[in-house]
Amino acid sequence: MSLLELFCHVDDFWQQFSWFWEAELLKSGLKQRRRAGKLYPSEIMTLLIYFHQMRYRDFKTYYTQYVQVYLTDEFPHLVSYNRFVELILSVLVPLCAYLRSCYGDCTGISFIDSTPLAVCHNRRIPQHRTFAGIAQRGKNSVSWFFGFKLHLVVNDRGELLALG
C-alpha cells in the first residue's frame, strides 16, 4: 500500500471515529483549550503505520532521516522528533481502534501462531524493572525468554482475525 492510499484509508477512518471518540470522552467540568495541533491525528497514525512498512530498525532513524528529509512535501507541518514522540500517546486509542477495524472475516480456515516478545536478556531478569510483575519467563521452540508471548490468528487470505 502506498503512502497516499494509507493516508486516505486512515483519514477516512479518523473522520468517522473522531465523532464517536469525542462523544465518549469524559468531561472534567473545567474549561479546556481545544487548539488544534500542527499535525492531525490521522497524519500521526499514518506515519506510525508507515514505519512498520519501511525497513528501518528504529523509529528515531526513520523519523529523522526519512520522514523529515523525504516526506516534507506530503507532511508540510512536521514537528520535531521529541514532540512527535509525545504526540504518539494521543493517538494510541484511535490506533488500536483502527487495527480492530482492519480485522478480516473468518473464512473457515484459520491459522494461529505465537512469537516471543522478550523484554530483556535472561541474565538481566533480576535487574529488570520496566515490566516487573507483568512479564514472565516463557519458552518457545528455540529457547527460554523473559517477556510476553504474542498470539496471532489469521485466515487463509492472510487477514488478521485476532491477537492476544
Where are the language model's segments positioned?
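Short alpha-helical elements
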Residues: 1-164
